[in-house]
């Protein structure tokens, strides 16, 4: 019995394909969110501007940290789903797939830990304006640097996933071409055998007729 379309990802291979696209989409979403903070980070880390630049960055992160709880839970849910997708990919990986899936999982796990341990608490400190460990300007610069590190790790995840997809498609094309070549060879050999068989039968028929005429 054929599977219905809604259950086309029910088998192991289909589940891993769905997880691969889930990793790509969720990682790209998180990367885009963090990259948006560059509007504030560029003037606090890469080219530190006047005091007004740090005031603007503080206002920006205060607004981000004070986002509606639905927005926060949505982002955290996507982060959690990304980890689940990675685990689905890595489970039962064999051969060269281990290198791709384990590396991607390690990079994302590192980025997730860095975000939970450093980025999220730092934004909360900005919201509360409770600068204890560092002065305000230094704190904002460290927060910007943490954002950059997380973005680099997520970019690595995206590149690994895209590299695997590219390699998978190239391998599929090569396997399809190899299968077509083998099919053509089999057809050629079959035609050759049929031709030889027909020639043999023709020779035997001629020989039989010659013997009959002699008799």
From Swiss-Prot:
GO BP of this protein: endoplasmic reticulum to Golgi vesicle-mediated transport; protein insertion into ER membrane; protein transport
Chain ranges on the Extracellular side, renumbered to this chain: 43-67, 127-147
What's in the keyword line of the UniProt record?
A: Endoplasmic reticulum, Membrane, Protein transport, Translocation, Transmembrane, Transmembrane helix, Transport
- Gene Ontology cellular component list: endoplasmic reticulum; endoplasmic reticulum membrane
Q: Does the keyword Hydrolase apply?
A: no
Q: Name one Pfam family in it.
A: SHR3_chaperone
Positions of the UniProt region annotated as Disordered: 190-215
Cytoplasmic side stretches: 1-21, 89-105, 169-215
Which top-rank group of organisms is this from?
Answer: Eukaryota
Q: What is its main location?
A: endoplasmic reticulum
Q: Its membrane topology, per UniProt?
A: Multi-pass membrane protein
Transmembrane annotation, as ranges: 22-42, 68-88, 106-126, 148-168
A GO MF term: unfolded protein binding
Compartments where found: Endoplasmic reticulum membrane
What spans are recorded as compositionally biased (Low complexity)?
Answer: 196-215
- Record's subunit section: Monomer.
- Family statement: To yeast SHR3.
Function description: Involved in amino acid permease processing and required for the efficient translocation of structurally related amino acid permeases from the endoplasmic reticulum to the plasma membrane.
Protein name as annotated: Secretory component protein psh3
Task: List the source organism.
Answer: Schizosaccharomyces pombe (strain 972 / ATCC 24843) (Fission yeast)
The gene for this chain is psh3
């Amino acid at each position: 019995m054929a599977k219905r379309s809604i259950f086309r990802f029910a088998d192991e291979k289909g589940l891993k394909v769905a997880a691969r696209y889930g990793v790509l989409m969720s990682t790209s979403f998180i990367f885009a969110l963090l990259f948006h903070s560059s509007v504030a980070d560029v003037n606090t880390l890469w080219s530190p501007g006047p005091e007004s630049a740090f005031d603007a960055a503080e206002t920006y992160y205060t607004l981000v940290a004070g986002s509606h709880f639905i927005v926060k839970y949505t982002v955290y849910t996507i982060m959690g789903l990304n980890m689940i997708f990675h685990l689905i990919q890595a489970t039962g990986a064999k051969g060269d797939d281990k290198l791709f899936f384990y590396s991607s999982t390690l990079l994302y796990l590192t980025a997730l830990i860095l975000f939970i341990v450093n980025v999220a608490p730092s934004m909360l400190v900005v919201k509360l304006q409770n600068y204890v460990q560092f002065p305000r300007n230094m704190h904002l610069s460290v927060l910007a640097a943490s954002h950059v590190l997380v973005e680099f790790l997520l970019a690595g995840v995206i590149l690994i996933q895209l590299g695997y997809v590219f390699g998978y498609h190239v391998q599929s094309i090569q396997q399809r071409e190899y299968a077509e070549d083998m099919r053509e060879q089999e057809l050629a050999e079959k035609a050759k055998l049929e031709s030889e068989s027909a020639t043999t039968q023709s020779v035997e028929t001629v020989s039989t007729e010659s013997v009959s005429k002699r008799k």
